[in-house]
Design a protein with these regions (language model features):
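Glycan-processing catalytic domains of CAZymes
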Residues: 1-205
Length: 205
């Protein structure tokens, strides 16, 4: 019943003909995928979540605040052009982090606030990953790493992040594939406890 576009663009490749991003040097897509997906979601009574634009600056600098500026324009532009679709059901704030990251609280808060303000309060969510032992670079030779996050540190860092964003972010879907199977219960318990504390929904990914 739900379809989520995890990002509307990455660096120069975009899913819809954004006049703002085209001026910034992005490539014109051959098909307006956003219009296509929303039309199909309308047809099949599905709820569509729009994923924000990822400029790539965060991956290069580890500072999430770089993503705020472009998305100010993207959020307004997308809602004005596509917000009439009955299936447009919410927003995915696509900066994917795992730990207390520079600029994260400010970025999630500002982007979440704008998404909700333009769309009369449609829901927003994030999907960070848990920095477990399997969270290694795909380009590297190692399958695991020694310096994985502890449950206690994960709880401490995400308590601080949720405290700063819960007013404008409705749900959090932690990516759990980076931790070991026998760690799932402990992390899930903490995630649910934190979500309940701040009135957020706890999803998984």
């Amino acid at each position: 019943d739900t379809v989520i576009m995890i990002r509307s663009g990455y660096r120069k490749f975009i899913t819809y003909p954004s006049s703002y991003l085209l001026k910034k040097g992005c490539y014109m897509p051959s098909v307006d995928l956003l219009e296509l997906f929303l039309t199909l979601a309308d047809k099949y009574d599905m709820k569509f979540y729009f994923g924000l634009y990822d400029s790539g600056h965060y991956w290069d600098t580890h500072d999430l605040s770089y993503e705020i500026e472009d998305n100010k324009y993207v959020i307004d532009e997308v809602w004005q052009t596509y917000g009439h679709h009955k299936s447009f059901g919410g927003w995915y704030i696509s900066g994917e982090i795992s730990r207390a990251t520079k600029g994260a609280i400010k970025a999630f808060y500002e982007m979440g606030k704008q998404c909700k303000e333009v769309s009369n309060g449609l829901p927003t969510f994030i999907s960070p990953w848990i920095d477990g032992k399997k969270a290694v670079a795909a380009s590297g030779a190692n399958l695991t790493k020694a310096e994985a996050v502890s449950v206690e540190q994960h709880e401490k860092e995400w308590n601080e992040i949720f405290d700063g964003i819960h007013e404008v972010v409705d749900a959090c879907a932690f990516q759990d594939g980076h931790i070991d199977y026998d760690e799932l219960d402990a992390f899930f318990e903490v995630n649910k406890k934190l979500a309940d504390k701040y009135g957020m929904k706890c999803w998984t990914n």
